[in-house]
């Protein structure tokens, strides 16, 4: 492909390299190199940082699995886990008669210990994800990370 820009509107046009579409190239369009095109369409630092934060939150949402049961790690579920743990501890109970997990399945006589372990594991994972996000954000700000496909999460 060969690319052109309209200097008045900044619209970018692409045409076949073989010349088969040359008759459609409007007068006044300016050819641009592949390198210039890549720079023009590359996300800004702010966009990359926003995308990075969204990706970290998506990782958090996945949560953890304890004894075959998934516990989501989003803020609402973290709060629900905390409240459930506090209630059970205040009531002196060690099992939930019924527990509805993050996959919308019900579990009978679900151990409080598993919920507590999940809550703790979610917190540990969240700390690791935020640390990784910080490292990647520094690389983005420095200009050494320009493609989030290179990001791997712990």
Regions inferred by a protein language model and the residue ranges of each:
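A preference for well-ordered globular domain cores
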Residues: 1-154
């Amino acid at each position: 492909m060969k690319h052109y820009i309209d200097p008045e509107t900044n619209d970018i046009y692409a045409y076949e390299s073989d010349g088969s579409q040359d008759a459609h190239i409007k007068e006044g369009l300016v050819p641009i190199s592949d390198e210039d095109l890549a720079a023009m369409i590359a996300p800004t630092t702010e966009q990359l940082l926003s995308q990075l934060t969204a990706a970290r939150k998506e990782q958090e949402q996945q949560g953890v699995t304890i004894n075959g049961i998934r516990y989501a790690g989003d803020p609402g579920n973290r709060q629900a886990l905390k409240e459930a743990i506090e209630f059970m501890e205040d009531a002196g109970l060690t099992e939930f008669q019924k527990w509805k997990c993050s996959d919308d399945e019900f579990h009978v006589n679900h151990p409080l210990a598993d919920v507590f372990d999940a809550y703790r594991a979610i917190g540990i994972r969240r700390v690791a994800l935020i640390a990784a996000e910080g490292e990647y954000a520094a690389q983005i700000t420095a200009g050494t990370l320009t493609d989030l496909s290179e990001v791997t999460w712990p």
